[in-house]
Amino acid sequence: GGVVPWPIRTVVIPPPILASIKSHVATHHPNEAGGFLGCQRRGRRLRATRHIPIPNESAIPKRRFETTVDERVPPPPRVFYHSHTSPESISGLTKLDKRSIPEPFALIIFAPHGNALSYRGFKHGVLEWRELQVEADTGRQLARL
């Protein structure tokens, strides 16, 4: 077999893509919004190169984000993201998120009032989800609550 690459530790979201995500989340508030980030792998980092917003198909969109993974979705490596919009919700993965997200990489954006306050990245390991760093282009960590 080949060499197993080092595990991903960081998601990098350049400013133009970050601005696009923020706008998408704010526009759909108080409903949860989401989509995918098409990425390139650079060593231990996933660098977002495209933002693909996807409609929320949940019957209870203020509480849950549900969508269909189809041809709109970029090929791996990719990061699935969605917002948590209720002030009572948490800034990380809920129990439901942990069970229901079928993707290896997830980004939760905590936006209880529409503006994104926190970005938390996660990778699905063998047994559980592990937290990743989330950075802007400059290597500075994005807000994390």
Regions found by a protein language model. Give the residues of each.
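Conserved beta-strand-loop surface patch within small alpha/beta domains used
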Residues: 1-77, 85-145
